[in-house]
Design a protein with these regions (language model features):
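An N-terminal hydrophobic leader/cap segment in hydrolases
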Residues: 1-24
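Active-site loop/oxyanion-hole signature of alpha/beta-hydrolase fold enzymes
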Residues: 31, 36, 76-121, 296
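Conserved HGGG/HGGXW glycine-rich cap/lid loop of the alpha/beta-hydrolase fold
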Residues: 31-87, 306
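Hydrolases whose catalytic domains are alpha/beta-hydrolase-1, hotdog thioesterase
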Residues: 125-129
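Flexible "cap/lid" loop of the alpha/beta hydrolase fold
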Residues: 131, 138-174
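Conserved alpha/beta-hydrolase catalytic His-Asp/Glu region
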Residues: 151, 174-242
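Conserved serine/cysteine hydrolase catalytic core
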Residues: 219-266, 278
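Catalytic active-site module of serine/aspartate enzymes centered on a nucleophile-bearing elbow/loop
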Residues: 274-323
């Protein structure tokens, strides 16, 4: 039976009258990449936010969150090596290398301290960045995080994108309509909890959106996605070391079967000053299924507002506190 949507009225979102975008070229160990710095005409209410997204997200992949947060703080989006416009990251390089490349962004922009958001594939990068330079991270947000990915799931993802890279009807790499829809459908099924779709907000809409996105992916991009998923299989995404000096929020959708609630809770338990909660009526794609709530939750945490009694989340837990 479908769950009733959580009753919640989003606050008024007053977009800034003017935003400015700057593309900043970066280089790390000979690899070229770029970040986007988005600022507004309003004074910031918290430290700049650096966003590290999933394997399928480039620096233009967060338009909804960008619109909702740009009035409150500078936003930094980045194509790390292996993503978007950046150079390819050698397959043997892991998440430690990506964390180093992410921290170059803060050095290049001259930020003493930042807020850091790591979502899905970006979570192990953000965790490592906070672990290595905790004094630079004011607050850490991890969405859809796990110490160890389900190897069957990751293998399925890798096979989907390897198949897209290999299957082409002609020299330009295009697929027939049937081939395109088959690959896109398989990709969507790896990210959404189809068994609970009647309990997930906007499940059908999000499935269609992702299907259209995946159907347009080129063989070159598919090869990159396959490499990203091989990286997840090569080693555990998160290190065993605890984070003791950074305040953190760890969350995901209550129906997430990519990084399960228990897996996210275990990540929160490895961070001394962590808060853990779940967003209701959502799965791994919570940023699309409940985008207003996603933005509200992040803004609340980054501006030190209470997270208690929110109608769209479970009660906050503090699993990282040492007994």
């Amino acid at each position: 039976m479908a769950t009733a949507p959580s009753v919640w009225t989003p606050p008024e979102w007053n977009a800034p009258e003017e935003t400015r975008e700057e593309l900043v070229p970066l280089e790390w160990r000979g690899l070229r990449y770029t970040c986007r710095l988005v600022t507004s005409d309003r004074p910031p209410v918290t430290e700049p936010l650096l966003l590290l997204g999933g394997a399928l997200q480039d620096m233009y992949a967060w338009p909804r969150l960008e619109r909702r947060l740009s009035a409150h703080m500078p936003l930094v989006f980045v194509d790390l090596p292996g993503v978007g416009t950046a150079d390819d990251l050698p397959a043997e390089q892991g998440f430690d290398a990506l964390a180093e490349a992410a921290l170059v962004v803060t050095d290049r922009l001259g930020f003493d301290r930042i807020n850091l958001l790591g979502a899905s594939y970006g979570a192990p990068i953000a965790y490592r960045a906070a672990l290595s330079r905790p004094a630079r991270v004011a607050r850490l947000v991890l969405a859809g995080a796990t110490h160890r990915m389900n190897p069957r799931l990751v293998s399925d993802c890798e096979q989907v994108w390897s198949a897209r890279a290999a299957l082409a009807d002609d020299i330009d790499g295009t697929l027939s309509d049937s081939g395109t829809h088959e690959i896109a459908g398989r990709a969507v099924a790896t990210l959404l909890n189809t068994a609970r779709r009647d309990q997930v907000s906007q499940a059908a809409t999000v499935a269609r959106l992702l299907h259209r996105q995946f159907a347009r992916i080129t063989p070159a991009a598919a090869r990159r996605h396959a490499v990203c998923h091989r990286r997840l299989l090569a080693s555990d995404p998160l290190p065993a070391e605890r984070i003791d000096a950074v305040r953190a929020l760890v969350f995901t959708g209550e129906h997430d079967d990519v990084s399960t609630p228990d897996e996210n809770r275990a990540v929160a338990a490895a961070i001394a000053e962590s808060t853990f909660l779940l967003v209701r009526d959502a799965d791994h794609m919570v940023h699309l299924e409940r985008e207003a709530e996603y933005a509200d939750l992040i803004l609340r945490f980054l501006t030190d507002l209470p997270l208690d009694d929110l109608p769209y989340t479970t009660a906050p837990e503090r699993p990282g506190a040492r007994r």
